[in-house]
Amino acid sequence: MSFRLILDIQDQMNIVRRLHRSARLGSDLVSGFKLKCGLELHTQLKTDFKLFSLSKTSFNEPPNSSISYFDVGLPGTMPKLNPEALRLALRLAVSLDSDINLNSSFDRKHYFYPDQPLGYQITQHYSPIATGGFLKLDSRYDGIESTKKDIRIEQIQLEQDTGKTNYVKFDGEVRIDYNRANIPLIELVTKPDFETIGEVVAFIKKYQTLVKYLDVCTGDLETGAIRVDVNVSVNGGNRVEIKNLGSTSEVAEALGYEYRRQIECLKENVSILQETRSWDGKSTTASRSKEDALDYRYVPDSELPVIRLHSDIKKQVQESLPQLPDAVVEKLIASPFNIELKHAQFLVNNKHVLSYYYNLIESIKDIDVKRANNWLFHEVFGAFSKNNLAFDPDKISPSSLARLLHLIFIEKSITSASAKILLGHLVTAPNSMEIEQAMEQYDLGKPTGVSESDIDEIVDEICTEIIAANPDVIKRIKDGKHKSINYLIGQAMKETEGKVSSDIFAARFKALIGT
């Protein structure tokens, strides 16, 4: 090791110590120090079988229970491409407006590591499945500072995932689970177009939404379905790679730290080494320098034929794609839906709920869409949330919710208060029920067999008793604090178990109080 390199390393260690002593690093940019960043995203594809074998893709099975001879590199086994992986890669590439390579091929990336039993990884180094394209960021939806920005794609390639290495500290053993080996991955490489940390985080979140929406991947960073490598440089200097970041918060923190570390190096006139670094939750640490970089000795894989695609393939895939997330959001926030942006984005991120919403809107008749929106997003989802339950459309189908809204607003046979109570019963019931059946079982419909005059008399009696019992509230109302009447209405609704409309009580209280 050269004397100069030793000095550089010592200087960088001093810088790291100063960074640790300083306050927690933020993500703000520093004037005069331009951030330049690119991403590599490794995305596990949602296929039933692995990339080059008939083993099931499995993430929850016991270790080494979902493997084939090829997955563990036994001699004499041959790879055979899973066409479903190719189909999903094409869906993603076309959605990003990438150029499809009509003659792509596979290569061997040679390195030795226990989680790669073949001694090489099958990837697409020379002729990837797609190149070019972009993902558009928009300040309206993505929270970036620029109005709009296209993040360009360098390339998209198919490759194998590796096995999973587990280091067991207490007995000093290294255990390898090959269930993950040969699971199909897409590696997507961007151009170094990111200039702020916010843009990086926005891109990753938008990419997650896209792959989930297209059913290409589960989109989870926490489980490793998407793994992120970040390439960072400041003022056009040497590029540093930070590998295997597992969440957007990790990406933001690691990128913020590395950006400021490089600024400190530049201020101190210390060389920034071109290297790979790891993030430990507090700082980035060197793991491999350019001098230690492996020679992967890429060679074409002679056991796999060239993938030859028809010249119309991009058009064919495009015709099979659904409307993409940004277009869906724009549609949902406009008439006739008029959904709030946050709710529209929630629907796009949860495609099964989006389908539920469309079915609900198709089912309602003579009911304002705004009312349907309010009941779905606030009352229905709220009922599941209050009971710590995930949304389950089997508990209350779109047609059942439409029927409930009709009973509230058209037939007026159940009050809003009673309907909210009914929702609580429906979401916790062991079996689904028809709306009328549930109303009868829980006695939540409006009183039947009672004349209008009888109801008026009951309302008068209840309101009079409540007014007499709450002189302080009456005084506040007469002094101009008109919202205090809501307390009285709440007491009346409780007295009638929600079976009489709050509007009736409101009108009667106002008449009796004289407001």
Swiss-Prot record:
SMART domains: GatB_Yqey. Keywords: ATP-binding, Ligase, Mitochondrion, Nucleotide-binding, Protein biosynthesis. GO terms for cellular component: glutamyl-tRNA(Gln) amidotransferase complex; mitochondrion. InterPro entries: Asn/Gln-tRNA_amidoTrfase_suB/E, Asn/Gln-tRNA_Trfase_suB/E_cat, Asn/Gln_amidotransferase, Asn/Gln_tRNA_amidoTrase-B-like, GatB, GatB_Yqey_C_2, Gln-tRNA_amidoTrfase_suB_CS, Gln_synth/guanido_kin_cat_dom. Allows the formation of correctly charged Gln-tRNA(Gln) through the transamidation of misacylated Glu-tRNA(Gln) in the mitochondria. The reaction takes place in the presence of glutamine and ATP through an activated gamma-phospho-Glu-tRNA(Gln). PANTHER family: GLUTAMYL-TRNA GLN AMIDOTRANSFERASE SUBUNIT B MITOCHONDRIAL AND PROKARYOTIC PET112-RELATED, GLUTAMYL-TRNA(GLN) AMIDOTRANSFERASE SUBUNIT B, MITOCHONDRIAL. This is Glutamyl-tRNA(Gln) amidotransferase subunit B, mitochondrial. The gene is PET112.
